[in-house]
């Protein structure tokens, strides 16, 4: 049986520090999220986090592409190289593949704690339903952003 692994990402935007704090709390309490599933915790954009910037060269969320064949100028962008590294590590064919990635964010929008979903994959709906049932969180389906 394959190991089920979930990637939990905080600090995708370096100026969003609450998710990083939450991940540190999860790590402190060894059994807080253990249900027979292996978790990988990472800071998505560590350099931007260290500097307190949203990003260095480009939005990390917009830096994931199907192909690594970018033009030479954009290849020098930190976030594009970081996105390639993350896919090489945690993508479906990566060295530590994860079946699901949960990207934690903060916002100034008045929407409270919630789940925002992109796309309509069945497994994602199942996970969102599980979280909604367990924590009573509202779920927002975001489909207008073609970049997602």
Where are these regions (language model features)?
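Structured catalytic-domain cores with a bias toward divalent-metal coordination
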Residues: 1-148
